[in-house]
Amino acid sequence: MSGNTIGTLFTLTSFGESHGPAIGGVVDGCPPGLELSVEDIQQELDRRKPGTSRHVTQRKEPDTVEILSGVFEGRTTGTPIGLLIRNQDQRSQDYGKIAETFRPGHADYTYWQKYGIRDYRGGGRSSARETAVRVAAGAIAKKWLKQRYGVTIRGCMSQLGDIQIPFESWDAVSRNAFFAPNETILPELEAYLDRIRSERDSVGAKITVVAEGVPVGWGEPVYDRLDADIAHAMMGINAAKGVEIGDGFASVAQRGSVHGDELTPQGFASNHAGGILGGISSGQDIIAHVAFKPTSSIPQLRHSIDKHGAALEMQTTGRHDPCVGVRATPIVEAMMALVLMDHALRHRAQNADVSVDTVKR
């Protein structure tokens, strides 16, 4: 399995499985001198961890992070930063019945076909449990970006199933389990998910992430465009099925006279492009939307096959989210941070001496 690393200059390599002893990662390329503590990382992990509401999996993982290397006397040393999160609430017995069968919608079938072996306990390496490591690494990137460039990265749930969530304020996001930017709609969201659960079903969601304060110039055309790398990172999240930058697919119905963001001496007049032009940051807010599919594990009888190809009916058991998107916001933020820090370092490496007089906004 060769796809466990993301980044060019600032990289994360993750390891571990859902029901193994631990998950972890190695963050390489972080500049020396960044003040970094366990608390800096833990506060981000606490936003993502399971068992925090009735609408997410009831697996109780404290997600306590350990920094194994790369930090001395509270500062990064420039060497690889080792991160470890021990698994403490595995129930492998819940998965014994699927050792030789393939759950519909999961990676069971493809992992078996590709590797000829799979860890069936909780999905093994394909489990979203691994995303805790991304959030931990993203916390480092978030802090560096904020201190070095004043970049702020914030996300929210903008749609749950067929319910659009109007944006009200960023302050509302931290006050509810949905990461919804609108508190008046919470009763509707609660009732909707309760109904989905009572029907023994699941539903998808859309997460919106905004990076504010990104300077002009980040991105490496033509193959490592900033928007291309953002899309690559987001599609690497479990259950992600689509990514939009700026107006995204709505651009199909727009005219050029609308979509093209006009410039004025004071800056851009609009931001349909989502803060990226030609694969390079424009200085505007970078805006992305990520679509997450419904949870594949639902307590209904489904048709499938076993590893010998025999037809069967199966019903998934275990502890699962009725909507994986409920906990996805910190993960989406983390992936945005990882990409932006990598591109900040790449831009600095080649273009640090470039200076132009045109207004930058």
Swiss-Prot record:
Keywords: Amino-acid biosynthesis, Aromatic amino acid biosynthesis, FAD, Flavoprotein, FMN, Lyase, NADP. GO terms for cellular component: cytosol. It catalyses: 5-O-(1-carboxyvinyl)-3-phosphoshikimate = chorismate + phosphate. Disulfide bonds: none annotated. Transmembrane segments: none annotated. Its cofactor is FMNH2. GO terms for molecular function: chorismate synthase activity; FMN binding. One of its GO terms (biological process) is aromatic amino acid family biosynthetic process. It is an enzyme of class 4 (lyase). FMN binds at residues 125-127, 238-239, 278, 293-297, 319. Its EC number is 4.2.3.5. Reduced FMN (FMNH(2)). NADP(+) binds at residues 48, 54. Pathway: Metabolic intermediate biosynthesis; chorismate biosynthesis; chorismate from D-erythrose 4-phosphate and phosphoenolpyruvate: step 7/7. PANTHER family: CHORISMATE SYNTHASE (PTHR21085:SF0). Belongs to the chorismate synthase family. This reaction introduces a second double bond into the aromatic ring system. Homotetramer. This is Chorismate synthase. It comes from Methylobacillus flagellatus (strain ATCC 51484 / DSM 6875 / VKM B-1610 / KT).
